[in-house]
């Protein structure tokens, strides 16, 4: 369990340094055969899980695939794309099913001698009410009907109140961790490629992924080959995506 001070100072990284790191990251399709050291992988994963996430429930998990035989089996599962020939692949999984254990973990691992009453109350009462959907999603259905009435009086959170909303909830936090992970590898000099092109059914069988886990991407990692980037970068004008209010 990693502990961090509550008053962590703002990072000394400059805007220019951050811009340089982000602009240097590209989706690389071809890698050399050079292995990624375990200490680099661990450091990057430690930075990945520092990503902001909903209620600190950290609904993610990662499978680090280094075994050459397993990587060879993954290649056709990933539509035989070149990026899937990387010397390291990390399966990034969203976990809508781990919130209950996470609530208990926060109480068990609280970094102070006494767990504040408000923390106990939130993780023993509020969070279970918020995230529990009940058998067949029936409790979620009850909450949706209850909120329709209660929300007439004041603003209320209206999600997640279904299994589908729980999946969205977990994916949002996990995507933040995945971005941390890619930038962390970039800072170590290793390129990445997030892959969505895979056969999920075969992927689950190959990696024995838990039934309720959601494979949101496979992250190829390695040293960039000479022709690793296929095309120049293209982004639409910012004005197409931003509204100032």
Predicted regions and their residues:
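Acidic, surface-exposed loops and disordered segments
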Residues: 1-245
